[in-house]
């Protein structure tokens, strides 16, 4: 059985006693023995002096200094009769303790600890007492010290733990007392106790001013570097914290925006669901546009003109869907299927070319035919009659168109150049007697052809092209060439009146003089039933066929 098997000498039991002077003593013993050094200690004059100072400090430490370091608690002294009392208790401890081997062992321990202390000068007494209290080296030194101090634990098998600890304290106190008495004559100096509180011991007395200055500069530089490091870490932590806060705020704002957009989406979906039936009705009724011959026309016009079978053959249904004649794709967004429809085919049909040939020429006054207007309100004006070209009139002679002008015997031959009319009535509003009625009836009978009758049944539409002539420019050119004598002919027809140069622009604009050039159709108005003052009866009793602007 070895001494290490006894648990009473472990650190937790031995060094946790705050009132015992043993921890400090043992701490001084194990100052340099608990830490391994990487370099071999070299004995120098400085090291020798440090060893001497340490020995003097340890050997001159009296009982009064020990009591002063224990917070004012006086440790009871161990007297020689106490050793006799301990021996009387039957503990088996011998009363004769040799002081010479103990002193030699103590001196050896001190010397060894001093040499290693200089090599490990970075540790002081306070730090060693704080850090080395729980090491296994402490119990080992305690066992070795107790074993060397007179074989204290020889007969302690039958004793208790408290008695054994008391024996250890008594042995240590007696050994320190004998060591102090033996070394009092050798060293009488009492240096002050070393008071260090840092990484290295305070040895300013042995340092030169240059070394002290270097140490101060180095410490200041280290402090500044440590402060900068701490500041950098704090700044980095603050930046990361601010970034996290900003990201959290952004996340909250995006979450709110997402919720708002979700609510808007739900509302729009609800509105679409509720208005889907209404949109179907609008697409089928309101937006339906009918087409006729490739052109867009209202439904009323087609319904009015669709009674005849001949008119229905001219209708060309052009739409996006082939089932009916309505355009349901006016707006691509209203299409329920969402696909884009093909553009409308608004090219005119093939029979439009034949219809355009029968469109009458535009008159000089720029009036619009009431039959071709789709959006004209109010009562329609009097009808305008268009006569065919004179080459196609079999019974009409140029002599019937010669109109006298008052007392003069000259006549005006008015040329008539026009095309086939678009529509006209079956009877002229001109009422007269004589052969003129028969001539007009013969002209009307010659124009009653099946083609014109078929055209009368078709509803009139606004044409997209107008082919008309402006012979007035030729008349102006003729008047410019004959400034001295006035106009003598209109479109190659000579004016045979003696008063050709006596009329000015105002008389031409007033009309009714017989000199008004007419290149378009002759359209008698409602005033033709009443005789104009200038329209005098001719010897042949023919009515006047002059037109006033």
UniProtKB/Swiss-Prot annotation:
Low complexity bias spans: 177-194, 304-325
Domain of life, per lineage: Eukaryota
Residues spanning the signal sequence: none
Ranges annotated as biased composition (Polar residues): 108-127, 333-343
Region described as Basic motif: spans on this chain: 214-233
Keywords assigned by UniProt, alphabetized: Activator, DNA-binding, Nucleus, Phosphoprotein, Transcription, Transcription regulation
Pfam families with a match to the protein in the record: bZIP_1 (PF00170)
Region of interest (Leucine-zipper), residue spans: 240-247
Renumbered residue ranges of the record's region Disordered: 108-143, 177-234, 304-345, 367-389, 510-549
Residue numbers bearing the Phosphoserine modification: 342
Record-level GO BP terms: embryo development ending in birth or egg hatching
Cystines in this chain: none
Known partners and oligomeric status: Homodimer. Heterodimer with Jra. The kay-Jra heterodimer binds more stably to the AP-1 site than either of the two proteins alone.
Record's function text: Developmentally regulated transcription factor AP-1 binds and recognizes the enhancer DNA sequence: 5'-TGA[CG]TCA-3'. May play a role in the function or determination of a particular subset of cells in the developing embryo. It is able to carry out its function either independently of or in conjunction with Jra.
The protein, known as: Transcription factor kayak
Source organism of this protein record: Drosophila sechellia (Fruit fly)
């Amino acid at each position: 059985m070895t001494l290490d098997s006894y648990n009473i000498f472990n650190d937790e039991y031995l060094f946790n006693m705050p009132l015992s002077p043993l921890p400090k003593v043992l701490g001084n013993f194990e100052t340099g023995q608990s830490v391994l050094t990487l370099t071999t200690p070299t004995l120098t004059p400085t090291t020798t002096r440090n060893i001497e100072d340490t020995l003097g400090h340890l050997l001159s430490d009296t009982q009064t200094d020990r009591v002063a370091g224990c917070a004012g608690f006086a440790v009871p002294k161990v007297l020689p009769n106490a050793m006799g009392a301990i021996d009387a208790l039957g503990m088996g401890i011998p009363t004769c303790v040799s002081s010479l081997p103990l002193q030699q062992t103590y001196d050896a321990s001190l010397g060894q600890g001093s040499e290693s202390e200089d090599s490990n000068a970075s540790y002081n007494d306070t730090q060693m007492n704080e850090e080395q209290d729980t090491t296994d080296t402490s119990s080992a030194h305690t066992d070795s010290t107790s074993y060397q101090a007179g074989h204290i634990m020889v007969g302690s098998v039958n004793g208790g733990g408290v008695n054994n600890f008391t024996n250890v304290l008594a042995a240590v106190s007696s050994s320190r007392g004998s060591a102090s008495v033996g070394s009092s004559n050798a060293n009488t100096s009492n240096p002050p106790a070393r008071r260090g509180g840092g990484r290295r011991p305070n040895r300013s007395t042995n340092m030169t001013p240059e070394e002290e200055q270097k140490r101060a500069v180095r410490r200041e530089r280290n402090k500044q570097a440590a402060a900068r490091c701490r500041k950098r870490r704090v700044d980095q932590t603050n930046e990361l914290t601010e970034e996290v806060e900003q990201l959290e705020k952004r996340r909250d704002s995006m979450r709110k925006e997402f919720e708002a957009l979700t609510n808007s989406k739900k509302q729009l979906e609800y509105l679409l669901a509720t208005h889907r039936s209404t949109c179907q009705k609008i697409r089928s009724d309101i937006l339906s546009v009918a087409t006729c011959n490739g052109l867009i026309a209202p439904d009323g016009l087609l319904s009015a003109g669709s009674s005849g079978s001949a008119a229905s053959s001219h209708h060309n249904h052009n739409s996006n869907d082939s089932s009916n004649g309505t355009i349901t794709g006016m707006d691509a967004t209203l299409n329920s299927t969402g696909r884009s429809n093909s553009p409308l085919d608004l090219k005119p049909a093939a029979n439009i070319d034949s219809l355009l040939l029968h469109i009458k020429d535009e008159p000089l006054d720029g009036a619009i035919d009431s039959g071709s207007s789709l959006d004209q309100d109010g009562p329609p004006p009097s009808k305008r009659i268009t006569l065919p070209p004179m080459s196609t009139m079999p019974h009409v002679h140029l002599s019937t168109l010669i109109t006298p002008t008052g007392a003069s015997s000259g006549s005006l031959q008015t040329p008539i150049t026009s095309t086939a009319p678009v529509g006209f009535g079956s009877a002229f509003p001109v009422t007269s007697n004589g052969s003129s009625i028969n001539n007009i009836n013969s002209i009307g009978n010659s124009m009653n052809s099946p083609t014109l009758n078929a055209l009368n049944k078709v509803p009139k539409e606004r044409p997209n092209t107008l082919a008309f002539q402006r012979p007035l420019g030729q008349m102006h050119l003729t008047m410019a060439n004959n400034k001295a004598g006035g106009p003598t002919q209109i479109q190659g027809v000579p004016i045979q009146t003696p008063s050709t140069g006596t009329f000015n622009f105002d008389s031409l604009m007033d009309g009714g003089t017989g000199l008004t050039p007419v290149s378009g159709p002759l359209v008698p108005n409602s005033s033709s039933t009443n005789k104009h003052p200038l329209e005098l009866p001719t010897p042949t009793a023919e009515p006047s066929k002059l037109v006033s602007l």
